[in-house]
């Protein structure tokens, strides 16, 4: 066993002595040592219950004959970090999470690992660490929050953000806003729609590294604790058989994950995260795969923020394995990839049942004929940009409008809420990329303001920043190269016409080639002052969004 390096031989008496200080017995020294990394804390709603999930994992490890050891990592709630300096640290925290786990699991040679995350950057950060370390591993998340209820309908955090915009234009009164605020988030779990956290936890199932139900079983259901025990049992079996993450996760696994992402209409952030995770697993993954597959995979699940359903409804309908059953029915699922169950995913999916034909529609009756995400290219995005196609209003699928340019998200939000943005405008927010922010903040407030102000069917927004999984509308993020790296988004001027064609996947600045070249030659990127040592280092090392916003290799 990997842990024998600290357990066996006379020379390891000091190591055993320290382990015995923890209460470890001689009998336990002969068993597999299982590390359990948890992002439990008392400030994130998605994490506040992870201590209970961890206790269930520990029970499962012991049931299977292993010895559990819990260690922590950090986490940030993007909702609480929104609209202030804290959002600059959200995406950068992903790299710290992966690094910190790699450090601990290298300093202590565990035989296996169980990863217990739940929210936006924590799940991908842990998956990156899993790929780097390549130790027998299972991921079990904390699960989604239940939707809130107000006035006879399900609501969630995005309802609150959009109600703020509604209040500004007199569509929502203060009493209603307060009621929505009080009821939207009823308890523990990752926010209830198909936002980034729930998308990533769902894709962990599709990759074969998490138990069935990982992405959809509600946080407060007892089934979540039973799944956590199962995760503890499974990891010990993987250790005994020496089955590592890279034995399970292949390019075909990523293709399954992308197809699930497209079919469900997942978060645009998955493009960033899957690219980064694939790199950690040593897999060459081109983001163009999203666009190639989106032409084949229809959008079949209408889940918040683009539809009326929530994650609990998807769970009731059969969950992610039922979505994969639709892929299997149409001959698209890569069936031969392995899973933590030591069974091929095709065999497991055959056992799944689709329990609601509207929540998980058949391919011949989709919500949209193409997948939920698209990659756009053009003179404004030579390395690509990302859009949530499932959230684009039909009348905005092709749009030409004048640019209204902002150098950060706050100024854009103020302009939108004060009525300065008119129908037909294209809001351009730049210097919000990985390097330029730094930190590639989410532009949830400006997009929610557009919706709340009643402009969602008339105004587009493009940015080198990113979006919350809760953003929807004619919005395009991850424009690459970013302005801070000399990208063409930096040469856009107020009043310039911008053409967006979601059908053709193009994003272009409508000026002459000569004018374009002249501006690019004269362009000097704005350099912002950065008041954080970590963010200065992050900005120095981070790569483009098209490369997953990972660090450059030394």
UniProtKB/Swiss-Prot annotation:
Keywords for this protein: 2Fe-2S, Amino-acid biosynthesis, Branched-chain amino acid biosynthesis, Iron, Iron-sulfur, Lyase, Magnesium, Metal-binding
The UniProt record lists the keyword Ligase: no
PROSITE patterns the UniProt entry points to: ILVD_EDD_1 (PS00886), ILVD_EDD_2 (PS00887)
Cofactor: [2Fe-2S] cluster; Mg(2+)
Domain of life: Bacteria
Record-listed [2Fe-2S] cluster binding positions: 119, 191
Pathway entry: Amino-acid biosynthesis; L-isoleucine biosynthesis; L-isoleucine from 2-oxobutanoate: step 3/4; Amino-acid biosynthesis; L-valine biosynthesis; L-valine from pyruvate: step 3/4
A GO BP entry: L-valine biosynthetic process
Pfam families referenced in this protein's UniProt entry, alphabetically: ILV_EDD_C, ILVD_EDD_N
GO molecular function: 2 iron, 2 sulfur cluster binding; dihydroxy-acid dehydratase activity; magnesium ion binding
Active site: 468
First-tier enzyme category under EC: lyase
Modified residues (N6-carboxylysine): 121
Cellular component annotations (GO), alphabetically ordered: cytosol
Keyword Iron: yes
Cofactor note: Binds 1 [2Fe-2S] cluster per subunit. This cluster acts as a Lewis acid cofactor.
Subunit (UniProt): Homodimer.
Similarity comment text for this entry: Belongs to the IlvD/Edd family.
The protein's role, per its UniProt record: Functions in the biosynthesis of branched-chain amino acids. Catalyzes the dehydration of (2R,3R)-2,3-dihydroxy-3-methylpentanoate (2,3-dihydroxy-3-methylvalerate) into 2-oxo-3-methylpentanoate (2-oxo-3-methylvalerate) and of (2R)-2,3-dihydroxy-3-methylbutanoate (2,3-dihydroxyisovalerate) into 2-oxo-3-methylbutanoate (2-oxoisovalerate), the penultimate precursor to L-isoleucine and L-valine, respectively.
Protein name: Dihydroxy-acid dehydratase
Annotated gene: ilvD
